[in-house]
Amino acid sequence: MSPHRETTGDESTTTTVPQNGTNGAAAPELVAVPTNGAAVKAPETLAVQNGANSRVKPIQRSSHLVAADLDGEFDLICVGFGPASLSVAIALHDTLAAGKKLRPDGSSPKVLFLEKQTRFAWHAGMLLPGAKMQISFIKDLATLRDPRSHFTFLNYLHQHDRLVDFTNLSTFLPARVEYEDYMRWCSAHFEHLAQYDHEVVSVTPAVKKADTVKLFAVEARNNVNGQVQTFRGRNIMLATGGKPSFPKSFPVKHPRILHSSQYAYMVPQILTDKNAAYKVVVVGAGQSAAEIFHNIQNLYPNSSTQLVMRQEFLKPSDDSPFVNSIFNPEYIDALFPKSAKGRSEFLVDARATNYGVVRLELIEELFERMYAQKRVLGPDERTWPHRIMGCRQISNIEPHGDRLEVKIHGLSDGVVNSADEEILSADLIIAATGYQRNAHIDMLKSTWEMLPKAVPGTAMFNKGVTGWNVDTEQGERKLAVGRDYRVQYKAGSVAGDAGIWLQGCCEGTHGLSDTLLSVLATRSGEMVQSIFGTEH
């Protein structure tokens, strides 16, 4: 994670989540979460847990967006109910609250959110004690689009009687657990529109008229009973978040190998003795890796930890004001028209804002810890309990009982040096190695035939800077989106009042802010405009 690496996706798939108090004083406690099946009727009011003082405040659900018959036709189905979809719900509410029409007859649009998690949660696995947000609270789910919205972070504070006290903190960066609580407060207004424990498996054309698709079918598996249910909608928005990514050298699955997205709630279950001398290997060079490396040492004072990374050293993130402008909403308009080569060069040049970088304060604290070990134990790092192992790569992992044998090789100019080998023993390996954001490709497989033919593949295309190539029986096709995030199907194949939109997987065309929180408020307004058009 970098200063902007507050991603929008929901990567956790567990049915238990940590209780998020805003004091962040201890490791998260595990609590059981009730499942929300398709047949559960939403109450008129909902209650959310306010982490500041454990008060429960009633939340009135949105009166502008009403629940529709699940067997009917929806105007919009959102796949995923994380921050991206939540911001769209807020934009819809605000548009209607302002007296504008989204349907010709002025009625409320029929909207449905399908979410595989048991309830709304944002990065539950990385809500660490003391962790701060890395973007300003002004870039919340509403302010940059409409500062008067009910759903601003400042109004959340006001509703919970903390606005003055928060002001006295003199910061733009709230605690991460408080910001997650803010988003859960927002989501509580729309719980009646969400079907949790529903994992979407496919989106297919459902109704055609003269070879033009008028309606799509969304198939979702109920994770409680395993049944597959079909929902129908004119417009479909895919906002599925990222899938945890592991290095190729890692076993396919092992109970003592975790992804950083599982950290906060899985580690206490595996490493149960706070005083034990556990050996933990953390893999990665970004903010999440550094935070976990730091946090393990605090939680388990007798542990030994190794931070293994291909980079030579931890690098600070660049969050200077001029560089920060690439996360401004208007920068998307400057980037999208560029050539594939221009966008590719931009992504490489801007990596220091978002990938493989760490906040300077944390780097300085970790360096101080490494220095203290050197001062007390001497220069031989192999005698230190905590090591940052740069220019290293894990080549192999072998299970040995309850432990893992980790074979590490040094890198020379990016190439593995077989002579530089070290074997570590680990009770736990945590991979802070990012996410894959390509679930939409297979999810839309049944629509590939409607895509235009692809120009012979180039290296640029593989980076997603112009889209994605897919192989069909009729040859290679091009899956790409327009400036409004709408999938570009062949002319006439999809009706003008129907379509599919992508969120959180368009970094190659729309910039580094695409997977982040930075532009959600303004982008959601654009999405509503694109899907529902101007006021009727």
From Swiss-Prot:
Region (Disordered): 1-25
InterPro entries assigned: FAD/NAD-bd_sf, Lys/Orn_oxygenase
Pathway as given in its UniProt record: Siderophore biosynthesis
Molecular function (Gene Ontology), one example: nucleotide binding
Residues binding L-ornithine, per UniProt: 139, 324-327, 354, 518
Pfam family, one: Lys_Orn_oxgnase
Summary of subunit composition and partner proteins: Homotetramer.
Function noted in UniProt: L-ornithine N(5)-monooxygenase; part of the gene cluster that mediates the biosynthesis of at least 11 siderophores, including beauverichelin A, dimerumic acid (DA), Na-dimethyl coprogen (NADC), eleutherazine B, ferricrocin (FC), fusarinine A, fusarinine C (FsC), metachelin A, mevalonolactone, rhodotorulic acid (RA) and tenellin. This cocktail of siderophores for iron metabolism is essential for virulence, and more specifically for the fungal virulence in penetrating through the host cuticle. Siderophore synthesis is also involved in conidial germination under iron-deficient conditions.
Record-given protein name: L-ornithine N(5)-monooxygenase SIDA
Organism annotation: Beauveria bassiana (strain ARSEF 2860)
